[in-house]
Structures are given as structure tokens and as C-alpha cells.
Amino acid sequence: MVQIHGIRRASADAKYRQMTGQPVKPLILKLCLPAVISNLVTTAYNLTDTFFIGQLGTAQSGAIGIAFSIMTVMQALGFFFGNGAGNSMSRELGKQNNERASRLLAVGFAGAVLSGLVIATIGLLTLRPLVVMLGSTSTIAPYAVQYLTPLLVAAPCVCGSFALNGLLRYQGQSTFGMIGLVSGALLNFLLAPLFIFVLHLGIFGAGLATAICQTVSFTILTTMSRKFGVMKLSLRNCRPDVLLMREVAGGGLPSLIRQGAGSISVTCVNIAANPFGDAAIAGMAIVMRIMLGANSVIVGLGQGFQPVCGYNYGAGLFARVKEGYWFCVRLATCVLVVLAVLLWVFAPQLVEIFRSDPAVVAVGVAALHIQCCTVILNGFNMMGNMMTQTMDRTGIASFLALCRQGLFLAPIVLILPMMFGVLGVEMAQSVSDVLTFLVTIPFMRRILHELR
């Protein structure tokens, strides 16, 4: 045991020297690459689900949009504990306080799994009225129930996977997180068509495949964290106190708000699209998945920056924090410009991949074109939110997280359709992105001034 402890101590010291001493730009690129790959593969398997289910019918495609709200809640809880504990953990590692970092790791993991168990229990007991409340039409609701049932059973593993990926990343070990997520996603590429078409399980088979793959990812991530993390995952270190829980809650609140607001906004989009029929719900569900893929690249870049930010902020190296922030903002904006052009040009073909119904395509293409005009602002918006979260500016980070998906989008998507019909649903996200950009500017000016 003494030898193992010594090895981990040496590993922690080496990681500290890497995070606080290596050139910032290459370091961020090295750390963000596994995160970007993880996000892209996860998005690809979400889109694969959308594609396969789209072959079953328009109502089944709409069910994916309903289920997305529940999945976002699971993500929110996983990110709350994973990012909440991870933010504080990276700062403690920057201060070389490894014992407290180990306790944060254990508390974050245990909290995520327990929250998933709560979601599973509540969801399974109230599933039918829940999907109706989330915007299902009478034709979509049965398929949403079928898809969500196995996913809710696996909710503890889903929440645990999201948390563990973040906890590994904040230790600077994003490659191991990538291995866990990519393994489950690749398995889904095989199981989804097998269950849906070969075993004739339909949309239930798609949900079952996703549940199995999330469980596999959880198992791999748990093993990786125990064997290869800078801090060993051990529930014996799960000794929460008031101050520790306050740190986790403060660090995770922006993630919870960001993902929770995302779930609310998806529900509001479904409710707003409901009067325009199944095609409108299905079209918006497809666009949300496509734009999630585009934004996942930028989220991956920010995830590479966060451990660098946490370590260096904890070590008092503020110039490195600022250098990393501006590098990520510029790179994210350039990437989004390229993606926006590609998505605009190939919008019809992209939507038709998932559903060839002309009504679905019309809604999807219009929404995709509008969102391409403003998606380039998300690099600045996301990097500001992720940096303030890592720096423990909980109030600012929580407010900025709430703006894009909650404070602005939720009311906008319910009001604009009253004036513009289905066009109001299609343009709501873009209006929200512009308002969020304008609000973020003064906050980031102040934060960057304080880092001088």
C-alpha cells in the first residue's frame, strides 16, 4: 500500500508540473483532443439512433425529441456532481492538496450514482404522464414510453458515466475518459440496428441498446478511474462534510443549470412545436441533434481548457489562465465558422438522412439555416461560462449558464410562434444566442480585468 501511495504521489507531482509548466496552447490541444473525440463519437451515436429510428416513422422520430429532455436531466445530474467535484479537485491539485482532492473524487462519484437511482425510480413510476407533460402528442407518447423504459433502468450508470468522464478530465486524464465513452458508443453502432431491425424490437430495441452501452461505458470508466486516475477512486474516501458539499454544489451548479435549462428548453420547443404536428416536433428534434454535434466540438475544446484553468488558477498563475482563455475563444470561433458554412450548404441532405418526409425536411432545413447564422457566437459564450465555473465564480457562471437555454430561450420559443407561427419555433434558438452573447461581454471584461 505504501508503494502504491508513493507511485500515485509521484504521478500527481508529475501532473502538476505538466499542467503548470508546459506551454499553454499545446497543452490545451493535447487535453482537448480526447474530449473532442469523445463528444463527436457520442454525438455520432446519438445521430445514429436518430437515423435508425427515423426509418420506423415520423412519430418514432418525434419520440426521440421527447426522450432527449429526460436524457438531458440525467446529463445535468452527472455533470453537476462530476464538474462540481472536478472543478474543486483541479484547484486542490493545483495547490498540491491531494488528500482533499481524493475526497472530492469519491463524493462526486457517489452523488452521481445515487441521483441516477432517484431519477430511475421517479421516472419509471410516472413515465406515461411524464412524456405527455413533456409535449408528446397522442401518437408519439407510446413510442416515447417504449424508448425511455430501458434508459431509465440504466439511469444510475448514465449519471455515473457523465460524472466519471468529467472527474478523469479534471485530473488531466481525458484520454481514459475518452476510452470509456467511445467504447460504449461503438458498441451502440452494432447493437442498435441489431435490436431494431434484426430482432424486430423497434424503438424499444433502440432504448435497450443505448442502456446496455451506457452500462458498459460506466464499467470501463469506473475501472479506469480506480487504476489510472491521478487520485484513486475509493468509496472509503467518501466522507462529505458541509464545506465539501458546498464546494461540490457551488462548482456543479452552473452545469446543473446549463443542462437543466437545456432540458426545459427542449420541452418548451416540443410544446411550441406541438400545434404544428408530428413533423414539426420531428424536424426540430433532428436539428437539435445536429447542432448538438456542432457545439460538442466547442465543448470539447472548453473541456480541454478547464483542467488547465483549474490547476493554474489554484497555483496563482493567472497569466496562463488568460492566455488559455483567449486561445480557446479564437480557435472555437474559427471552427464554428467552418461548421456553419458546411451545415448551411448541406442542410437539406443532412435532414433527409434522418427523415425524408417533406414536411419534416422543410422545418429542419429552415431551422438549421437560421441557427447557422448565430452559432459562431457560441465559442465566446461557452468559454466564458466554462472559465467562470472553473474559477469558482458560481454566481456569474450560473447566470450565464441560465441565459442561453433558460432565461432567454424558454420564453422566446413560447412567444415567437404566436407572432410568426412555426418560423418562431425555428428562429428562437438564434435569438437566444445573440442575447446571451451581449450579456456575456461585460461579465468577461470584468473577470479578465481581475486576472491582471
Language model features with spans:
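Transmembrane alpha-helix boundary and packing residues in multipass membrane permease domains
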Residues: 35, 39, 50-51, 68, ...
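Small-residue-rich hydrophobic transmembrane alpha-helices
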Residues: 61-121, 158-177, 283-347, 378-397
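Transmembrane helical elements of multi-pass membrane transporters/channels
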Residues: 30-49, 150, 184, 213-217, ...
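Alpha-helical transmembrane segments of multi-pass membrane transport proteins
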Residues: 26, 41-42, 78-79, 119, ...
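Helix-terminus/linker motif at the lipid-water interface of multi-pass membrane proteins
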Residues: 40, 44-62, 131-138, 194-201, ...
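Transmembrane alpha-helical segments of integral membrane proteins
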Residues: 382, 408-417
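Short runs within selected transmembrane alpha-helices of multi-pass transporters and secretion channels
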Residues: 82, 150-169, 177-188, 206-219, ...
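Short alpha-helical transmembrane segments in multi-pass integral membrane proteins
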Residues: 1-32, 89-156, 187, 196-253, ...
